[in-house]
Amino acid sequence: LSTKKIYPAASHDVMYRYMYEEILIDFIPFEETALGPTNSWLKPGFKKAYPVKIGELEIKILPISLFLASKWEAYKSRGTDPRTSHDFEDIVYLLDNNKELVQDISNAEKDVQRFLNKMAREILHHPSMSEILECHLNPYTVESRIKLVIEKLRQILSLA
């Protein structure tokens, strides 16, 4: 990696975090290694990844349902407080900003649907549901956006 000017991110305590110029990159293996665990949704996610062109560069993107599943697994494995979790923040962002999310989940494999159904159930039944969602939404649009996020969670709950 160093030949490509990619170096460990010294100021971060995440095992697989590296820096390329000013960009943080997480390299997470598909299989568990001596360095640590993996995320069970990455391998199936990259099998279904599709190419996207950004200028001259082509990258592969995970289907949103599998990316969301990977974020929920990451949150469950290391998050204790959804209000301060970066993984949970990402989950709320995806729920808030991806118009195709529910459709993608409805087309996903049944195991993905069941996993995300549990996620939706857990969030909707959280004793501080409004608070854990609101703290990751724009304060100027929180009233309308929280309704949208809750509606998407209900739709996900109805899929499996």
Residue ranges and their predicted role:
Residues 1-160:
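Compositionally biased terminal segments of proteins
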